Swiss-Prot record:
Disulfide bonds: none annotated. The lineage of its organism: Eukaryota, Fungi, Dikarya, Ascomycota, Taphrinomycotina. Residues 257-287 are annotated as: Disordered. This is Uncharacterized protein C25H2.10c. GO terms for biological process: tRNA acetylation; tRNA modification.
Length: 287
């Protein structure tokens, strides 16, 4: 039995070493790819690794609450007479499942003050971020993490790619089975990219939303977030953006109980109001 126990320990350690190497390899990825979803995280300079460690813990707890079906239901009630061969197979199978179904993957971007946490289905990045910020109103959960920017899906950086992705996300909320006028705004952030301009983004998004809806920079119900990172575009459409202090965990926690919105003269993180004011004109002349 002792020999078999040693074999079991050796196999488990070997597999865990391989699994850890696989995680480290993914951790060293330095870019976001097409057709991914996740959360862009901003941090103080040099605190990317510390932030990723704490936010993964927070997200893991919230995923267990929001999507309990993702949690393992295996009961580790090994019977006393269980064969070691079966125990080896069970342990390796468990590690393989973790490997294949990892729900959160941190990705450093070779850019200061920002990194990406990739998510897998059924995780909804918008719901995860909004829930985390709601919890953050009354509970200090992180030290190094600042803004959480959900990205529902990514695509290439051409105008055609932007239009296709934007349409797929905008239509269900603005057109398909929807009635009435919706107040909206657009926030475009561009990092490490020089070809696509904010005007291009505003013009394209405004045309897809259509003239039947209204831009309202102060009291918008829906905010269309467009992130351009190197050669990738990511988009999400969110609510409660200002109520949740632009998804900034530090600001959410400091928020007074009765505060409902951000003062108009507050400095928005890359939220270029002057640029957004041209959206109405762009929409009228886009067609």
């Amino acid at each position: 039995m002792s020999a078999l126990s040693e074999i079991l320990s050796y196999l488990i350690i070997s597999f865990e070493t391989s699994f850890t190497f696989h995680l480290e390899f993914k951790y060293k990825r330095t870019g976001i790819e097409k057709n991914e979803s996740g959360v862009l995280v901003t941090v103080p300079r040099g605190k990317e690794r510390q932030s990723s460690s704490e936010i993964l813990d927070v997200f893991t707890q919230h995923i267990a609450t929001l999507w309990p079906e993702t949690q393992s239901s295996d009961q580790e009630n090994e019977e006393e007479g269980e064969e070691l061969e079966d125990a080896v197979a069970k342990e390796i199978n468990s590690l393989q499942k973790k490997n294949k179904k990892e729900l959160l993957t941190p990705i450093m971007l070779d850019m200061p003050c920002v990194y990406f946490v990739k998510t897998r289905p059924p995780i909804d990045p918008v719901r995860l971020v909004e829930f985390t910020c709601e919890v953050g109103k009354t509970k200090k959960m992180t030290r190094y993490t600042q803004r959480l920017i959900p990205i529902v899906r990514t695509t290439g950086v051409s105008l055609d790619d932007l239009e296709e992705l934007a349409k797929s996300l905008i239509d269900p909320l603005f057109h398909e089975g929807q009635e009435g006028i919706k107040e909206f705004a657009v926030q475009a952030n561009i990092r490490n990219h020089t070809v696509l301009k904010k005007d291009d983004i505003y013009r394209t998004v405004a045309r897809i939303v259509g003239k039947q809806h209204m831009v309202d920079l102060k009291n918008f119900k829906l905010l269309i977030l467009v992130q351009v990172i190197k050669n990738i575009i990511g988009i999400s459409i969110v609510q409660n953006f200002e109520e949740l202090r632009r998804f900034n965990l530090n600001e959410v926690y400091k928020q007074p109980e009765n505060t409902k919105s951000i003062p108009n003269d507050s400095k928005l993180d890359n939220f270029d109001r002057d640029k957004n004011q041209i959206i109405n004109d762009k929409a009228e002349h886009a067609e």
